[in-house]
């Protein structure tokens, strides 16, 4: 191959320009960025692995690009033959190269987005999550509310300062990229950004170029594969690193922008520092649903670690604040306090373990005296948490630390009041205000940890108790009897059980978790979430167990409804719960309900799940109103469309009217955390997007659907569910086909999360977790769970009455919920390719199932055509040239990885599959070994032929990076 005529072979750079002939906009530098990173990468590849391998990568890319041009399946076969002819080491290098190039393409795109001038799209236009054109900008939102919606500035200000967005970080599905690589990616992004800055000197340029090369090489030389599964503590540390890197500084920066935006509409005061605009919670180390690795001890560790990190972050800023507040003028209250502190601290005035202000602070610097005391207590708070974490005990008495936020805020508020009283408000509104806002947002625990547990586990505990008390089996009681017993116990005072209760491992685990909640400070925790909740007794059971385990300030109990039947029954269950007097008195007019997007989608398909979630929210809000309760909806959205993902602000703006009402909780899932908080500007945009969309939804709710639209949706949902279930649950060939046609069985090898892929080890689709279910279909680019059901539903109503097509088009144009639902599926079709799925079938599926695969692909094409008709589009994504351009740029890389994956799966599953290795032409074949062979040694324990397992995992990671969603 080395002597092949290279003139004919266009470089990848030229290929890119052929694929995307036109710039999308004036400032479109995407192709330029992409080409620069790839040129650098190919140079590195040649240096490390020789010209032959570089040419192989280019040849592979070219075949892939030819397939993308004409979709000729013969090209896939040629590509397959070329890839399978590589030896083990080379095949790992090729898979690694394409995975790496996709990561670089993502980085080029992020830099482009950060720099592109925002092209205003008309409201409601859909574009991808990461696209700069789909902003909910806080300034524009405020202006729009005042100018277009005729709201008074004061109304807007009141609504804004009373609203709360609580972002809940979860570990699953875990980011499939290792943290070691994420950090290198961040540096590549920064270098690329600086390279294209306007005022760069030739020397700067040369140094940045070298730095870029260095980081690309370092990333390529890092093992992308996690060799051991992460523990929940690892996941928690990974999640917390975003606070350190971006969120901690990002929150006060964002709140300053809100102040500025308010000023621009004529409000001359700032958002109060204690207004809970943004809150953060976490599930990492608290979510034990189906994850046996999250033990009570893990929960305790995670809370202590977060407390230590919070104290450390405050501690790292306090000396800067002491430098800033050097004033001597202060009010009487502060003067008295500073004098007291000065008198009491004379004895031990030298503190050598501090870097600044280590000697006694003179009395004419009262702010510093007071902040010096805050610093001492922060230091002790951090050290005590560290001791407890490392040894389980600490010699530092608790009273020398901060135990609640109020005592931490008090001296800071005193400084703030004093500065304002002395005419120094401008100084007070500097770093001190930022610090106060951080304390209000993050408290002493950094995040509040939610606890999540399956309802059956609580039932088991209560069953053990009732049997021990010899009053029967709780498990066998009717719902009425359960409620009656729980309420009589909750109204009484006597303890239910003593230390003599016989406990299995599972029961001890549940009770120990409640003991940890009782032992740690209240501000460590958020909600107690019950998954698979179906009845009021599920909620009352947790209330009783909290009391029995001496939880002084019980956590709010949040039922999670996720299966279709549970969503349908949720409003009635909530009404029954609110009709219990004891419970209504307990909740003080506030209730939270979580709705799950992923399991409802797996259970009934995306169409019916989306509509049922919409209706359930409307009904739940009505029930809450009836009982005078303020309801907060907690949205458990995944990162992928199949699990309820998609652009944040559009998802918020398409919720039913009155369901958000200024308080929103939403999960930010593992693989989306990096896209939301990976960098300062991303963090800023995420906070802005959630805040602006929540405000707009509350003050200018979307329209309610017309009665005829509802009737049509109800009818279509029945058909969609029928079709989905007839294939997924009733078709006898389906499970076998799914296992053969996708890498589902091999998913567990990726070590992406601490949680097992299945709730129970044996069983069919229903026991599979939603994440691997979606992941497997995403890998083959067939995306079945997202679109299955839509086609049958559209077809049914259009055949019934041809005028319905106009009704559907009217719904698409006027109703945000319907539009977002359709647009998300259209985006997934743009990322799909049934030709690739057919290749997996041909290689991996037994011949008697081929006709079934063809039937599914026919349904795919029919659904796509109907969808375009409803949206009034001739072509996929015609309304979004940005996204279309970005997907076109990636397709050739992803296709290579798909072909590589399909053939690798074939070789793993069929060891007798015959491949023809090509002869070595390069000089290296004479040598004993070449650099690529070292890669095989990274996985010495694989049960397959050398190199196969790593090649497979690299293709999985690469495809996930290319499609920008994993599970």
Curated annotation (Swiss-Prot):
Q: Where along the chain is the active site annotated?
A: 172, 602
Q: Which PROSITE patterns does the record cross-reference, listed alphabetically?
A: PEPCASE_1, PEPCASE_2
Tell me where in this chain the PTM Phosphoserine is found.
11
What EC designation does it have? 4.1.1.31
N-terminal signal peptide: none
Record key words, sorted: Allosteric enzyme, Carbon dioxide fixation, Cytoplasm, Lyase, Magnesium, Phosphoprotein, Photosynthesis
- What reactions does this protein catalyze? oxaloacetate + phosphate = phosphoenolpyruvate + hydrogencarbonate
Q: Where in the cell is it found?
A: Cytoplasm
Q: Name one GO molecular function term.
A: phosphoenolpyruvate carboxylase activity
Matching entries from InterPro entries are given as:
PEP_COase (IPR021135), PEP_COase_bac/pln-type (IPR022805), PEP_COase_Lys_AS (IPR018129), PEPCASE_His_AS (IPR033129), Pyrv/PenolPyrv_kinase-like_dom (IPR015813)
What does the protein in this record do?
Through the carboxylation of phosphoenolpyruvate (PEP) it forms oxaloacetate, a four-carbon dicarboxylic acid source for the tricarboxylic acid cycle.
How does the annotation summarize its subunit structure? Homotetramer.
Kindly provide the name given to this protein in its UniProt entry.
Phosphoenolpyruvate carboxylase, housekeeping isozyme
Q: Which organism is it from?
A: Glycine max (Soybean)
Organism phylogeny:
Eukaryota, Viridiplantae, Streptophyta, Embryophyta, Tracheophyta
């Amino acid at each position: 191959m080395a002597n092949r005529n290279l003139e004919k072979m266009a470089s990848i750079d030229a290929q890119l320009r052929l694929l995307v002939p036109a710039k999308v906009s004036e400032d479109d530098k995407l192709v330029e960025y992409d080409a620069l990173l790839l040129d650098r990468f190919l140079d590195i590849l040649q240096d490390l692995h020789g010209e032959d391998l570089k040419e192989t990568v280019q040849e592979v890319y070219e075949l892939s690009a030819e397939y993308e041009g004409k979709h000729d399946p013969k090209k896939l076969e040629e590509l397959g033959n070329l890839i399978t002819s590589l030896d083990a080491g080379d095949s790992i290098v090729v898979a690694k190269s394409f995975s790496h190039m996709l990561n670089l393409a993502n980085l080029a795109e992020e830099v482009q987005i950060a720099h592109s001038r925002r092209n205003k799209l008309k409201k409601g236009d859909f574009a991808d999550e990461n696209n700069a054109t789909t902003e909910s900008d806080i300034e524009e939102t405020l202006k729009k509310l005042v100018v277009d919606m005729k709201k008074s500035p004061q109304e807007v200000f009141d609504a804004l300062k009373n609203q709360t967005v609580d972002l809940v970080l979860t570990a699953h599905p875990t980011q499939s990229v290792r943290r070691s690589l994420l950090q290198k990616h961040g540096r590549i992004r920064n270098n690329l950004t600086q390279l294209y800055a306007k005022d760069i000197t030739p020397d700067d340029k040369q140094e940045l170029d070298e730095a870029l090369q260095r980081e690309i090489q370092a990333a390529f030389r890092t093992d992308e594969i996690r060799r051991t599964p992460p523990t929940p503590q690892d996941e928690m540390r990974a999640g917390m690193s975003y606070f350190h890197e971006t969120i901690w500084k990002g929150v006060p920066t964002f709140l300053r922008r809100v102040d500025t935006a308010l000023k621009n509409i004529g409000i001359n005061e700032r958002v109060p520092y204690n207004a809970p605009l943004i809150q953060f919670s976490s599930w990492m180390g608290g979510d034990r649903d189906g994850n046996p690795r999250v033990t009570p001890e893990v929960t305790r560790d995670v809370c202590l670690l977060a407390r230590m990190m919070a104290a450390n972050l405050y501690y790292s800023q306090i000396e800067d604040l002491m430098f800033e507040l050097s004033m001597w003028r202060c009010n009487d209250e502060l003067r008295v306090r500073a004098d007291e502190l000065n008198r009491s601290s004379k004895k031990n005035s030298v503190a050598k373990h501090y870097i600044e202000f280590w000697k006694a602070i003179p009395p004419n610097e009262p702010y510093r005296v007071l902040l010096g005391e805050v610093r001492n207590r922060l230091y002790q708070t951090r050290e005590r948490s560290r001791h407890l974490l490392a040894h389980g005990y600490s010699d530092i008495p608790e009273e020398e630390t901060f135990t609640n936020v109020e005592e931490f805020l008090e001296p800071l508020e005193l400084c703030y009041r004093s500065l304002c009283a002395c005419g120094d408000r401008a100084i007070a509104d500097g770093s001190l205000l930022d610090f106060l806002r951080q304390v209000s947002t993050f408290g002493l625990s950094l995040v509040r940890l939610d606890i999540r547990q399956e309802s059956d586990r609580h039932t088991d505990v209560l069953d053990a108790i009732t049997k021990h008390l010899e009053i029967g089996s709780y498990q066998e009681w009717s719902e009425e009897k359960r409620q009656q017993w729980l309420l009589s116990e909750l109204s009484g005072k006597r303890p239910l059980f003593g230390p003599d209760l016989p406990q299995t491992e599972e029961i001890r685990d549940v009770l120990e978790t409640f003991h940890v909640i009782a032992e740690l400070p209240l501000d460590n925790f958020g909600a107690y979430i019950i998954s698979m909740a179906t009845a009021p007794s599920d909620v009352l059971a947790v209330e009783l167990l909290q009391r029995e385990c001496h939880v002084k300030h019980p956590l709010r109990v949040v039922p999670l409804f996720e299966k279709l039947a549970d969503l349908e029954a949720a409003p009635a269950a909530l009404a029954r719960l609110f009709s219990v007097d004891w419970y209504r008195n307990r909740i003080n007019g506030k209730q939270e309900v979580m709705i799950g997007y992923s399991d409802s989608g797996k259970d009934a398909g995306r169409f019916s799940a989306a509509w049922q979630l919409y209706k359930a929210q409307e009904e739940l809000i009505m029930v809450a109103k009836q009982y005078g309760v303020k309801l907060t909806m907690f949205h458990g959205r995944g990162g992928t469309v199949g699990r309820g993902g998609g652009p944040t602000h559009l998802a918020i703006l398409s919720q039913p009217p009155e369901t958000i009402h200024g308080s929103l909780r939403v999960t930010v899932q593992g693989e989306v955390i990096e896209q939301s908080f990976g960098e300062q500007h991303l963090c800023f945009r995420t906070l802005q997007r959630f805040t602006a969309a929540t405000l707009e939804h509350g003050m200018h709710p979307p329209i309610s659907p017309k009665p005829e639209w509802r009737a049509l949706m109800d009818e279509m949902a029945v058909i969609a569910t029928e079709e989905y279930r007839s294939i997924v649950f009733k078709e006898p060939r389906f499970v076998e086909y799914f296992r053969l046609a996708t890498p589902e069985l091999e998913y567990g090898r990726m070590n992406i999360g601490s949680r097992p892929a299945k709730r129970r080890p044996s069983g069919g689709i229903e026991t599979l977790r939603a994440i691997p279910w979606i992941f497997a279909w995403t890998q083959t680019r067939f995306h079945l769970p997202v679109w299955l059901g839509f086609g049958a539903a559209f077809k049914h109503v259009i055949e019934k009455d041809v005028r319905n097509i106009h009704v559907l088009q009217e719904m698409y144009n006027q109703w945000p919920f319907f539009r977002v639902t359709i647009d998300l599926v259209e985006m997934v079709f743009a990322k799909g390719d049934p030709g690739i799925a057919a290749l997996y079938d041909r290689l991996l599926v037994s011949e008697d199932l081929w006709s079934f695969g063809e039937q599914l692909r026919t349904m795919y094409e029919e659904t796509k055509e109907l969808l375009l008709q409803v949206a009034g589009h001739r072509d996929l994504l015609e309304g979004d040239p940005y996204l279309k351009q970005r997907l076109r740029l990636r397709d050739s890389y992803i296709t290579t990885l798909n072909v590589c994956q399909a053939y690798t799966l074939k070789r793993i599953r069929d060891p007798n599959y015959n491949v023809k290795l090509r002869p070595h032409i390069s000089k290296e074949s004479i040598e004993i070994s070449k650099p690529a062979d070292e890669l095989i040694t990274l996985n010495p324990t694989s049960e397959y032929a050398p190199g196969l397992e790593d090649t497979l995992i690299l293709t999985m990671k690469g495809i996930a990076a290319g499609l920008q969603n994993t599970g």
